[in-house]
Amino acid sequence: MKKIMIDGEQLTLQDIIHVTRNFYEIELSEDAKNRVRNNRKVVDRYVEEEKVVYGITTGFGKFSDVVISKSETEALQRNLIISHACGVGNPLEEDVVRGIMLLRANALSKGYSGIRLETLSTLIEMLNKGVHPVIPEKGSLGASGDLAPLSHMVLVLIGEGEAIYQGKRMSGREAMEAAGIRPVVLTSKEGLALINGTQVMTAIGALTVYDAINLSKISDIAAALTIEAQRGIVTAFDKRVHEVRPHAGQISCAENLNRLLEGSTYTTKQGEIKVQDAYTLRCIPQIHGASKDAIQYVENKINIEINSATDNPLIFSEDNDVISGGNFHGQPMALSFDFLGIALAEIANVSERRIERLVNPQLSGLPAFLTEKGGLNSGFMITQYSAAALVSENKVLAHPASVDSIPSSANQEDHVSMGTIAARKAREIYKNAVNVVAIELMAAAQGIDFYEGYTLGEGTQIAYDTIRNKVSKLQEDRVMYFDINQCANLIFSGELIEAVEKAVELQ
């Protein structure tokens, strides 16, 4: 079994994918183990000396002024977890749950949270053995961290709650017993250390960003196919145009289009048939490129967050100091994930408009709705309806969650981020966008089939062949949702991008 070493400093987005989807195991580095041990000594000293320190010898939130005795330490930590496990809704997907466990373990391995090494090791053992807590998707305010969903994770760690183990849903205690893992009895600071962080929103967001990077490339592929089906003008993608407005995403998109369309005889030059195309063709680098830049921005923020200490209070063992701060606040990620959702919504917006250009005979010069016997057959008519519905839904979802805040804990926690809502929305927008782009891929391939005697580009030929391997040309009306699902799966699975990138490097 392949392993990834974690130390709170060097985790990457690709590491997250390996652990969440390829089931790599994780292991603590020796340096991380030493940091955790040394950090814990400070907590033990404060408890022994009965110093009043938030989260170690006090209650939580509004109860931060209530002092807790040494004899009540274990009860305090247990009560924290069981009282905070108030999530509702459907369980989060397996890859998200694995991401949450990984990111929390990595944050704790930095050695600022005061957790015992054996407790952290048990969380890692759960991940490695595939004990996946059932974590409801809703209930987090995104400050003080993802308290409710992370509490559901910790329930299983202490032998409570529910988990999925080897494909079966069972009680947390049953899952731990079946996996041969001894549940933990939490002691001072540990409950708070485990649930006070942004790992739920960040896990959802990290997976979505990874997928969004691939979707941004596939949207370039879909656009290139549409350009060919429309006999579009490639002069607009001349690198000189983009070098004088040097946004990185714009330049990358123009380069992608040029590489994909290299050798195509479907495409035209400026003035050959017409002077210029509509914006949804001519401005693809500017539109797609802006989304690429936004996705890159969010990826950069994620790379910081996945290697950050997001607990409160933080324990600085070298200075023998404990400081209450606000690193649990999800605002940096909330704004980022709202931005991500907007970027993905725009990918779908422009894709749907290109679908309209393909199915509308007044715009395309192709048979109406891409069918030869219009009237008897409806062809691609309703696929555009579906795309329009998804795009409209995305416009609602793209409203930022981070502009909202509802005070909690008797106004002690009087500003919250709603970052987990932002991450969940971005994930839903991504799924909708995939289906819109899938419809464009199908429609563009259908449009191309009405031409004879032309050659596709180096990249678009591979894309076309991959699509046609799953979805045949529409000769007469058939049940289309099967085709949409097949084409969407080419995107979700990575099959399409892998096939194209074997021949054409995309950015």
Curated annotation (Swiss-Prot):
Catalytic activity: L-histidine = trans-urocanate + NH4(+)
InterPro entries (alphabetical): Aromatic_Lyase, Fumarase/histidase_N, HutH, L-Aspartase-like, Phe/His_NH3-lyase_AS
Record location of the 5-imidazolinone (Ala-Gly) cross-link: A143-G145
UniProt-listed Enzyme Commission number(s): 4.3.1.3
Post-translational modification remark: Contains an active site 4-methylidene-imidazol-5-one (MIO), which is formed autocatalytically by cyclization and dehydration of residues Ala-Ser-Gly.
GO CC annotations, alphabetized: cytoplasm
Residue numbers carrying 2,3-didehydroalanine (Ser): S144
Pathway connected to this protein: Amino-acid degradation; L-histidine degradation into L-glutamate; N-formimidoyl-L-glutamate from L-histidine: step 1/3
Top-level taxon: Bacteria
Residues of the signal peptide: none
Keywords for this protein: Cytoplasm, Histidine metabolism, Lyase
Family: Belongs to the PAL/histidase family.
UniProt cross-references to NCBIfam families, sorted A to Z: hutH, PRK09367.1
Protein name: Histidine ammonia-lyase
Source organism of the structure: Alkaliphilus oremlandii (strain OhILAs)
